[in-house]
Amino acid sequence: NQEVIDHIIKLCEQSHIQGLSILGGEPLHPRNIDAVIELCKAFNAHFNNAKSIWVWTGYLYENIVNKDIYNHVDVIVDGQYQDELHDFRLKWRGSSNQRVIDVKETLKNNEIVLYCD
């Protein structure tokens, strides 16, 4: 609801906050994705796209049902965590099957582009 969105945005107004991380519970599940998109739109509008939005999901990028999310986030970390593929050396993900996808570059190139630090 709008009250929750406003609260999240207010918390993120602090200058040391560089962006918004959305994870847990499965944010891109069909029951959740519309609310997540609404939050992302409001966040981007408020900060004029100056702060990044990252989403962690168990879905593969190609299988996300509501593709509109691609227009509102910067990075998607996709794929289910797999304990047997756990590697503590990985950045931003827990297992080697997961991808850290640069969504804006992926859309520009029409193929998966991995995020590089």
For the regions a protein language model found, what residue spans apply to each?
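Conserved Radical SAM active-site core
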Residues: 1-55, 59-66
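Auxiliary Fe-S-binding modules of radical SAM enzymes
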Residues: 10-14, 58-117
